[in-house]
């Protein structure tokens, strides 16, 4: 079995975010890392929408990311620390839209190791040096400079190693143009290591150490070190030189401290806490991330606590000495992994879990009544300030980036009866959790819908003048009339536009600079800017059946297949070409391309005929109306559309932006198929045809503009958009009802919209999330969803949600009541009334936990619910709250053989589980009966068990439960479940159970899979095979009777299969002593499974399912990852395909090595050597290679570049999208 890996949706969780001017213009951009992906985002300063400019897979783990700018430069570079053992400096090239590797210096081994640098990066604020550090011991400093040609150069590394030292954080200190300096949070563990009593370990202190790079001596010295009172978790650089006092802020538990050299005394200020917080009062508070904003006149920091509260931190200085730190509560946003304050006044928040946000900073919070806390205020040691959290006041949300991270569970099923299956994804954490329903398609925003007086058959938009940015008229054609609407604040009917209203319209367009043309069945109407009208009438009884128009040309087909060609002369007159062209059959459809910039005319006309052919006809004056080429079609054409697509933006000498792309002829057939063919711009030849089936209706094609490039809207029983995005073609359905006719639409409110008609309504639509594979509907949940099952009859979902360190609703209410009573009791006689009012206000206050976070209850505190949900409407039908410290871990829906048709839900619950050191007071299996057509849970009984029931699976009319490391068969009893049989020989802890026939495949938390056979006659569970590798299995899926696919905690996917000679018939041993099964092999079962395939995905996979994703497609193995990625593994159907892709992968490894310097083969073989899998993500980078490299690779494969990319597209569309 050979598989091909494809990513459908890249990881969405963000681990690092940096900002700067990466394209060299004044625009602010953000570079984010999503595990093994680098992405460049550009927030539009006018609309606030975030656009993705570039996404690159780096095939390595990005461990740190920094931006720097050389002194006097205008462009930021990116320095990346990864697991490749190399430091890499990247530059973004806007002309090619790619990251270019400028420098790659090797310094150590690959892999994420504790003493190989890469975990921490720090840059001197003036861009003169960069320090790259390991978690332990090693630190290297590289000096950055320019050569004579102003190119960036990098020195050889200077060492600043110190053995037995752990590093917690590193920053560059802003010292102006003095020798560059770096500050590190370190801890020396040498004494603690050598002291057997453990006393030294208890007294070990963290130190703040400054390293100075002496540029004169080219040497790094350890300048200064001092022990810290509290344990710091990160450092913030304070602007220095002429901008500020320099030094660092140390964020530690409960305090923030300012430190600098010389006579500067330490300034420390406690971190304020929420008033009346339900959190455990003993729990400390830390800052988790920060962002700095610096202008010429001032600077401030925004720092966020682990509850999500952002504080604005300012420093008061007196002659370069800091005198106090001031903190002011700013706003509360979800807890971030990284924050960036952009110069354009935006705050980008990359959330730890869930969606990411872009906020506009509306106020700086200087002049509001929020109290300001200062280090100068007198406080007892151990006391702190209190503030009241509130909804957003200084920030305004302007954009939200959908993120599925973390996906904890996923099932694929067509519960909504839509032909195409939906993905039901449980994601998020705590109160920000959600169940999301993903459908393949682009999200459509409806801008306006208006009723029309009848059912129109076509719609167009035209501009008044070629220089206009926006459209002026919408023209709607009916069976016997034409309606003209003007576009302004509102859309109104106009009568003086010059259009003929008493006839249907075939087409209309802007002609030349400022004239309009209307083609109707009896003639052509040319309307000048001063409302003069020229008409051309059809001869005799002939009428116009089809037409094609652009800015300078009009072609019409008369009845009988006669073509008449008009072209505009320099004076703005429409002139008919002297000859007419008779076609051999009736014309069904025609298309002209737009006139290329700087040219007089479009050279080609495409004509589709009844005889199932499409012909390209020249419009060049030298051979006008001469046929150039022809293509036979499998069915009759319905519509044609010539577009220029896939171009990269180029700037010419005058700075004019234009794009150089390829001409494509799109052909929509009457049988619902779309063909895309390359049209040669010189000869007019047609080549390289791609085919896609779109739906059951004939395909109509319309040209629209998306992100400044031409795109094609194709309408069949579903509407599809064909567009080029990041050097790849996308053909994506729109998640919207069926449309009949459309045209591009540009107005002030909606610069790149679509106007469309559907029955008797006119709709204005916008597509904002180009490049998105899925559109999603999210239903909020209360705690982190762990697993869910689908009830087969009602299609409802039964979800278990569990959170550690959390209170149940009942405990929360109880704690609040208790705190309110304490408030009243603590008050003196005269303050009683005031205290009572405060207590009442506190009880009534209800801040949404999805924004403000849930209170942290402490270790060993659990909260759980069981929810029954309708997945289509997303409404909760039933909710069962479990008691405090009961944690639901497993769920199953099953029927018992002795109870007939009733469905039961079993939920495995742990009681008082403490994770570290692990202890558990036992567990229960709750049994519920599904009543009321699967909408309500009726509690039957709970069965006590001695360990955590982490896996439940129905089995032959009974149920299998993994209780800790015991595998048991239970049956339903009146008062509880009855134990029928057990096996005690599983190694550690059962994390999953799959069943097929008499076989049970058990996943162990550390020891991979164990195959068990149930013998009915002797009522025994007997282990007959296991795996030879230890695998920390997270999820498994059965592929057939002998084969199982599994994933582990470290990001690997494997497929293991029992060899054909495996014997599970224990009864057949004639001697009766069952010797084979008792013998054992390699400390395990007597028979071993074989590994069919191994592959390192690079993200922890938490669900696997064998399914088909598109109607009529083939089966594939779909996986989802913790970081929000969705991918598939698809089998090759032929040897030659496998051979071809193996060679593509081999050539790309050498011709197009990964961006961060990691070896592709060793990345995919991180834990186990990669076996029988070809990496489609690498193969698809073929499309983004430079054309000459593409040519070299395809010549090695005896193909042309279009043939190679066609193969890549075909394998993708056969299984997915």
UniProtKB/Swiss-Prot annotation:
Q: Which Gene3D superfamilies match?
A: 1.10.150.910, YVTN repeat-like/Quinoprotein amine dehydrogenase
Listed GO cellular component terms?
A: catalytic step 2 spliceosome; nucleolus; nucleoplasm; nucleus; SAGA complex; spliceosomal complex; U12-type spliceosomal complex; U2 snRNP
The segments labelled Interaction with SF3B1 and SF3B5 in the record are 193-231, 786-804
Q: Name one GO molecular function term.
A: U2 snRNA binding
Segments carrying the region annotation (Interaction with SF3B1) are 1028-1049
**Where mainly located?**
nucleus
**Phosphoserine PTM sites in chain numbering:** 156
**Annotated region described as Interaction with SF3B5, given as residue ranges:** 1100-1123
Site residues by UniProt (Interaction with SF3B1): 988, 1171
The UniProt entry's sequence similarity note says: Belongs to the RSE1 family.
Entry remark concerning the domains of this protein: The core of the protein consists of three beta-propeller domains.
Tell me, in a sentence or two, what this protein's role is. Answer: Component of the 17S U2 SnRNP complex of the spliceosome, a large ribonucleoprotein complex that removes introns from transcribed pre-mRNAs. The 17S U2 SnRNP complex (1) directly participates in early spliceosome assembly and (2) mediates recognition of the intron branch site during pre-mRNA splicing by promoting the selection of the pre-mRNA branch-site adenosine, the nucleophile for the first step of splicing.
Name-wise, this protein is Splicing factor 3B subunit 3
Starting at the broadest rank, the lineage of the source organism is: Eukaryota, Metazoa, Chordata, Craniata, Vertebrata
Gene from which this protein is expressed? SF3B3
């Amino acid at each position: 079995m050979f598989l091909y890996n494809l990513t459908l949706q890249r990881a969405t969780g963000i681990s690092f975010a940096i900002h700067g001017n990466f394209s060299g213009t004044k625009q602010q951009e953000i570079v984010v890392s999503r595990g093994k992906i680098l992405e460049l985002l550009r927030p539009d300063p006018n609309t606030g929408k975030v656009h993705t400019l570039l996404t690159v897979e780096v095939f390595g783990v990005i461990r740190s990311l920094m931006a720097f700018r050389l002194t006097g430069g205008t462009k930021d570079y990116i320095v990346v620390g990864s697991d490749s053992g190399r430091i890499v400096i990247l530059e973004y090239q806007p002309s090619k839209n790619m990251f270019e590797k400028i420098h790659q210096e090797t310094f150590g081994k690959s892999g994420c190791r504790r003493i190989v640098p890469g975990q921490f990066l720090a840059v001197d604020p003036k861009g003169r040096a960069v320090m790259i550090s390991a978690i332990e011991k090693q630190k290297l400093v590289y000096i950055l400079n320019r050569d004579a040609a102003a190119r960036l150069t990098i020195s050889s590394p200077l060492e600043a190693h110190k053995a037995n030292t752990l590093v917690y954080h590193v920053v560059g200190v802003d010292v102006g143009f003095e020798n560059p300096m770096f500050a590190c949070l370190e801890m020396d563990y040498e004494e603690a290591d050598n002291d057997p009593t453990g006393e030294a370990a208890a007294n070990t202190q963290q130190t703040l150490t400054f390293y100075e790079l002496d540029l004169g001596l080219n040497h790094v010295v350890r300048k200064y070190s001092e022990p810290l009172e509290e344990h710091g978790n990160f450092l913030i650089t304070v602007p220095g030189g002429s901008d500020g006092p320099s030094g660092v802020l140390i964020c530690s538990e409960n305090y923030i401290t300012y430190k600098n050299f010389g006579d500067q005394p330490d300034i420390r200020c406690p971190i304020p806490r929420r008033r009346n917080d339900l959190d455990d009062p003993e729990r400390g508070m830390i800052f988790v991330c920060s962002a700095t904003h610096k202008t010429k006149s001032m600077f401030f920091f925004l720092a966020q606590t682990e509850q999500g509260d952002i504080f604005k931190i300012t420093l008061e200085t007196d002659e370069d000495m800091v005198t106090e730190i001031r903190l002011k509560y700013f706003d509360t946003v979800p807890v971030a992994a990284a924050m960036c304050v952009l110069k354009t006044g935006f705050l980008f928040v990359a959330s730890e879990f869930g969606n990411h946000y872009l906020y506009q900073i509306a106020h700086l919070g200087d002049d509001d009544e929020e109290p300001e806390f200062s280090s100068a205020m007198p406080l007892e040691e151990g006391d702190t300030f209190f503030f009241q959290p509130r909804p957003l006041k200084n920030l305004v949300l302007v954009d939200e980036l959908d993120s599925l991270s973390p996906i904890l569970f996923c099932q694929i099923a067509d519960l909504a009866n839509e032909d195409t299956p939906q993905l039901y994804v449980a994601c998020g954490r705590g109160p920000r959790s959600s169940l999301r329903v993903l459908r393949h398609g682009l999200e459509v925003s409806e801008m306006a819908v208006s009723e029309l007086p009848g059912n129109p058959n076509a719609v167009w938009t035209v501009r008044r003048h070629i220089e206009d940015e926006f459209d002026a008229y919408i023209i709607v054609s009916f069976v016997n009339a034409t309606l003209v609407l003007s576009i302004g604040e509102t859309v109104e009917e106009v009568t003086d536009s010059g259009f003929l209203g008493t006839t249907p319209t075939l087409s209309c367009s802007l002609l030349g600079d400022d004239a309009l043309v209307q083609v109707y069945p009896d003639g052509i109407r040319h309307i000048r800017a001063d409302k003069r009208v020229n008409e051309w009438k059809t001869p005799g009884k002939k009428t116009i059946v089809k037409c094609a128009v652009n800015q300078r040309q009009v072609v019409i087909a008369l009845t009988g297949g006669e073509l008449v060609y008009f072209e505009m002369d320099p004076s703005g007159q429409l002139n008919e070409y002297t000859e007419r062209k008779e076609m051999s059959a009736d014309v069904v459809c025609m298309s002209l391309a737009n006139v290329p910039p700087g040219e007089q005319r479009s050279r080609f006309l495409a004509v589709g005929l009844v005889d199932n052919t499409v012909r390209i006809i020249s419009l060049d004056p030298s051979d006008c109306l001469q046929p150039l080429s022809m293509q036979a079609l499998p069915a009759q054409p319905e519509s044609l559309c010539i577009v220029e697509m896939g171009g990269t933006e180029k700037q010419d000498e005058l700075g004019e932006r234009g794009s150089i792309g390829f001409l494509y002829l799109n052909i929509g057939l009457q049988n619902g198929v779309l063909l895309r063919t390359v049209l040669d711009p010189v000869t007019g030849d047609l080549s390289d045809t791609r085919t896609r089936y779109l739906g059951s209706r004939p395909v109509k094609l319309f040209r629209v503009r998306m992100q400044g490039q031409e795109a094609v809207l194709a309408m069949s029983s579903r509407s599809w958009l064909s567009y080029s995005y990041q050097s790849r073609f996308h053909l994506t359905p729109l998640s919207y009802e069926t449309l009949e006719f459309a045209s591009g639409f540009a107005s002030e409110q909606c610069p790149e919209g679509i106007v469309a008609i559907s029955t008797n309504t006119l709709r204005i639509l916008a597509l904002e999330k180009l490049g998105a594979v899925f559109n999603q509907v999210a239903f909020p949940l209360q705690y982190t969803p762990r697993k869910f099952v689908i009830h087969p009859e009602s299609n409802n979902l039964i979800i278990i949600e569990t959170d550690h360190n959390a209170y149940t609703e009942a405990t929360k209410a109880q704690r609040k009541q208790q705190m309110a009573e304490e408030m009243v009791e603590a008050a003196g006689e005269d303050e009683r009334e005031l205290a009572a009012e405060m207590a009442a206000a506190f009880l009534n206050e209800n801040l949404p936990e999805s924004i403000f976070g849930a209170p942290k209850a402490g270790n060993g505190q659990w909260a759980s619910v069981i929810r029954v949900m309708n997945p289509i409407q997303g409404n909760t039908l039933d909710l069962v709250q479990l008691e405090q410290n009961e944690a639901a871990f497993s769920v199953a829906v099953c029927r018992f053989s002795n109870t007939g048709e009733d469905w039961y839900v079993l939920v495995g619950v742990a009681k008082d589980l403490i994770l570290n050191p692990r202890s558990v007071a036992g567990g229960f299996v709750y049994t519920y009966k599904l009543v009321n057509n699967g909408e309500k849970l009726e509690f039957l009984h709970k069965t006590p068990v001695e360990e955590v029931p982490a896996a439940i699976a129905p089995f032959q009319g009974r149920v299998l439960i993994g209780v800790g490391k015991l595998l048991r068969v239970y049956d339903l009893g009146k008062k509880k479940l009855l134990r029928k049989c057990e096996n005690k020989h599983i190694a550690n802890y059962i994390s999953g159970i799959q069943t097929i026939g008499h076989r049970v495949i058990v996943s162990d938390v550390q020891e991979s899979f164990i195959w068990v056979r149930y013998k009915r006659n002797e009522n025994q569970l007997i282990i007959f095979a296991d795996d030879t590798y230890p695998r920390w299995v997270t999820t498994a899926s059965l592929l057939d009777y002998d084969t199982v696919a599994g994933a582990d905690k470290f990001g690997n996917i494997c497929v293991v299969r029992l060899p054909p000679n495996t014997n599970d018939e224990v009864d057949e041993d004639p001697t009766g002593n069952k010797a084979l099964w008792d013998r054992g092999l390699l400390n395990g079962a007597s028979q071993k499974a074989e590994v069919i395939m191994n592959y390192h995905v690079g993200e922890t996979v938490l669900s696997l399912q064998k399914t088909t994703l598109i109607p009529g497609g083939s089966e594939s193995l779909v996986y989802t990852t913790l970081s929000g990625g969705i991918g598939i593994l698809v089998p090759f159907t032929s040897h030659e395909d496998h051979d071809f892709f193996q060679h593509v992968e081999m050539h790309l490894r050498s011709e197009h090595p990964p961006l961060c310097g990691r070896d592709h083969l060793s990345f995919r073989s991180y834990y186990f050597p990669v076996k029988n899998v070809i990496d489609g993500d690498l193969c698809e980078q073929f499309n983004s290679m430079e054309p000459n490299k593409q040519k070299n690779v395809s010549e090695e494969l005896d193909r042309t570049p279009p043939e190679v990319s066609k193969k890549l597209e075909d394998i993708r569309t056969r299984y997915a999208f």
